[in-house]
A protein has these predicted regions:
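SAM-dependent methyltransferases
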Residues: 1-2, 23, 49, 144-146
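C-terminal binding/interaction regions
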Residues: 4, 10-11, 89-146
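Glycine-rich phosphate/diphosphate-binding loop of Rossmann-like nucleotide-binding domains
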Residues: 5-24
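A general structural signal for well-ordered alpha-helical segments in protein cores
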Residues: 15, 42, 46, 72, ...
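A short beta-strand-loop structural module common to alpha/beta enzyme folds
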Residues: 28-39
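Helix-adjacent hinge/juxtasegments
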Residues: 45-85
Length: 146
């Protein structure tokens, strides 16, 4: 699977661990940065990762900052994106099963490395249920963009 990633300086270390973990599993990762600890603005990195998903260049995307809040808001500003801020495995599973999210956000100051990788594995590995009631709700949600 081709997965976009993006982060700010506050989540660089965790992003690098997530990227290495995904690549080890055989996923192709497109890393939109940041690549240094220099202070930077999360919207540009989150938006770049989200645009890659929205355009179809990548199938899914993962964005990170210290809390995950800023990058999730930024990603959700891009048409076609459904980004969930995740801090537990149950939500990672349910947001794929019911909401067919195409992006997820993590807070490096909220989840540790082990939990983050477990969340990533669950989210990446869970398919949308395809149930009519969930698709109907997603369609209504996406219609709000128009």
């Amino acid at each position: 699977m081709k997965i976009s990633v993006g982060c700010d300086h506050g989540a660089l270390a965790l992003k690098n661990k997530v990227v290495a973990h995904l690549e080890k599993q055989g996923h192709e990762v497109k890393d939109f940065g940041t690549h240094t600890l220099d202070s930077c603005d999360y919207p540009e990195f989150a938006a770049a990762a989200a645009k890659a998903v929205a355009s179809g260049e990548c199938e899914k995307g993962i964005v990170l900052c210290t809390t995950g809040i800023g990058v999730s808001i930024s990603a959700n500003k891009i048409d076609g994106i459904r980004c969930a801020l995740l801090s537990d495995v149950w939500s990672a599973k349910m947001t794929r099963l019911h909401n067919d999210t195409n992006m997820m956000a993590l807070g490096a100051g909220i989840v540790g490395e082990n939990l983050a990788l477990e969340i990533v594995d669950t989210w990446v590995g869970t398919e949308f249920s395809g149930e009519e009631r969930h698709q109907r709700r997603i369609d209504k949600l996406m219609a709000l963009e128009k």
